[in-house]
Amino acid sequence: MDDVATAQSENENLRKIRNRLMQWESKTDPLAALSVQQEEHLDVFANLWRDSGPTLPVGTTPTTAEPSDEANTEGAPTKSTDDIELPAEGLQNTNDFLLWFVDVNAEIEQRGDAVYHKYLQQLEQRKAECSHMLGQISVAMDRLGALSDEYEFVSQKTSALNTASEQLIDEQEKLQDLSNEIQRRLHYFSQVELLNQRLQSPTLSVASEAFRECLNKIDECLNYIEENPKFKDAATYNVKYRQCLAKASGLVRNYVTSVINQATEATLHPKNSATDSSSALQAPDAAFALYYGKYQTAAAKVKRVVQLIETRLEHSNDYTQLMTDLQQHYLAQRASVMSPAVNLSIQNVKTAHKGDHCSLTRSACGFLVHVCQDEQRLFYQFFSTGAPHLTVYLEGLCTILYDTLRPFIIHINHLETLAEICSILRIEMLEEHVQQNPSALEAFATIAHQLLQDVQERLVFRAHLYLQSDIQNFNPSSGDLAYPEKLEMMESIALSLQEPTPLRRSDSRASVISSVSSVLETESVDNSYRIKQMNSPADLHGMWYPTVRRTLVCLSRLYRCVDRPIFQGLSQEALKLCIQSVSYAGGKIGAAKTPIDGELFEIKHLLILREQIAPFRVDFTVKETSLDFSKVKTAAFGLLQKRKQLFSMGSNNALLEFLLEGTPQIKEHLLDSRKEVDRQLKTVCEKYIRDAVNMLIGPLITFLDKTQSLLAQAASTTASTPESSSPKASYVLRQSPWASPQQISSIIQETQRMIKAKLAVLQRAMQLYLSNRDTEFIIFRPIRNNIIQSFVKLEQLLTTNGYSTDDMIITSCPSAEQVSILLSSASILAAEGVASFAAAAARKISTSSSIEGAAAGGRKLSTMSNKAELLRESKAEELEAVRSEAAPAPAESTPSENVVAELEVPTSAQASSE
């Protein structure tokens, strides 16, 4: 047990010793803390020990170990440890190590101080060198001070010499500049004699370079003297230089005029040619060579001299006057040459186009256009700058054209000729030629505008006379009023010309191709039938009423020839007279045939009129101003009543009130031609609808009117005698013998017979006159609605006036659905005649063996049964609308405003306004 306890105590002691040894180098609280330098040395020793190994011989030198961490703390010396060696006998214990460590540490410290000792020696050496250098610098500074004093003395002497030299040089330069300025100024005064001598020299040529230099010197000297008028004798020398300039201008004027005169003489009197100017006019090339060849040759001589003057126009007014004189002389010479030639040429053109005013105008104006262009081109071969005198000269040439054409224009009576001349002047001349070359044709444009205004004035005057004579005072012949015979004749001619050729199938095997071809041919027949339904043959050939055709032709002529305000006034008058003429013709046709024919005639031509004036892009509204004197009468009557206040001094002076209240008022009225056409069309449509309803259900309308008057009389009687009001008093209609069920039944049967008999005639007339399905439908719709409303009104009267069920059965009054079916069946019967054309065309088409071809042909050719079904279906929706619109108003009161508003511009009139 003692041994065990002893062992445990020893182990406990060893554990404590180990713990204490571990606490020597504890990171948190070490018992023996080492410095950084000591830790570094220990690391070095550890590395050396690790590298040497336990079997390292005693006398060997360990391998040099590099420090692992080169970034030591500041101030720690970095020394090589190559020469540090362990003791020969090695390190046996801790004491040996500590002794060896003390020696090594002392040696290391000594080695570290050696560097500082060496550096101290170097500093002491540098200090000695600096002391020696300071001594030498002090000696050099003493010498530099002496040298600076000497330099300052020399600098002062040199500066004084330079100042004196500069003053002398400045004075010399001033004197030299003064001398040069005097010479320069005297130069402008000393040139006058030299210039006079040169200008008086007989050998001086205007086209030479010496003459150019003379002009340059004259301009230069004259400009200088004018800029310095205060110089001595400046006015005298100004006069002298003006004289020199006048001499030079005279030389230029004489030279240019002589060259131009020679060209004029050679043109008017050619020496080496046997032909004169009149014979030369027959050939254009010869005429151009005669009238422009000599001048083009002279232009080369004159151009160089003229350029001398043109470049100096801004220097002096003398040059401007000289240039004006030269241009005037040139234009005068050209006028003497060209005026007779132009006059003779226009006379020849007038003779060649005698009686043809349009060709005369076109040829004469075209000739003047070429003359103006050639004259401007020739003018700019002489002169570079334009001149207003050229325009005056060309206007003189163009005046010959004006004087020649105006006598013809003021005697032309045909509107077509005047309109054609307007087009020639406005479009061909002004818009085409003048706009392409406005500068050369400015004078021609002025004369052409004057001619155009004269033609327009004559055109307006003749248009007024034409409207009065051929439209207002037009007396139609029997052929003009032959309606509907004329339309029927044109329709029969059109049907005979539209007979299609039969189709043949080339091969029975190509059944598919033949079926497709049959479908295409069927479509073409259907399209031709549709076109036939939309276009009246009379409209296609322009066979309108003469006044309508003349009005539209007149307006189309005036539209492109006169200004918009003038056209608006003329169109207002023309449309007004045309409407009156159509209304007059419609009345005569209605008196000769039937009112329906007259009204359809008027509707047809009013629609044509409205369609044809639509392309005119102009406002047909005209403003008229008038004076309203209505207040003058009232004011005068008030003045007579207030005679005692005529001279009253107060505010109620009668005379002042008369002057203030009796002033006539200016009123402006806007007249719209298009609205006038629509207003007349509305009136005619109302009349036509009323007459058509009376024609179809006249007995029923008469009965309803009579019934209304009877019921109104009974109502007034009942209101005057209240005691007589009994339930039977309201059955006065039933008690009337003419309103018995039998009489009403006969009226209804007669009305139905009239519908069946006359509806086809009515629709045939509408198709013949209007030839437009949409227009026919729009006009026929209120007729149909009025008929249905009349029967609905009759049914309401019978129901509310004591008629029993038996009476209703006796009367056999049809319902709205029955009336609609009746009208539809009658419409189908009326359409049979129209559909005969398509049926005949369909029969001529060869049937195909394929089912597809037959089906396609069946789809394209509509039969009468299909039409009936379509009509029944289309009328079903209209019945409800008719019932809702049914009212006790008279049958003839239809909303014709909607009819006119819905009327489309008919496509039947294909002839354009042109």
Swiss-Prot record:
It holds the Pfam family COG3_C. InterPro entries: COG3_C (IPR048685), COG3_N (IPR048320), COG_su3 (IPR007265). One of its GO terms (biological process) is intracellular protein transport. It is found in: Golgi apparatus membrane. Belongs to the COG3 family. Residues 53-84, 874-914 are annotated as: Disordered. Involved in ER-Golgi transport. It is a peripheral membrane protein. Residues 874-883 have a biased composition (Basic and acidic residues). Keywords: Golgi apparatus, Membrane, Protein transport, Transport. One of its GO terms (cellular component) is Golgi transport complex. It comes from Drosophila pseudoobscura pseudoobscura (Fruit fly). This is Conserved oligomeric Golgi complex subunit 3. Transmembrane segments: none annotated. Residues 53-64, 884-897 have a biased composition (Low complexity).
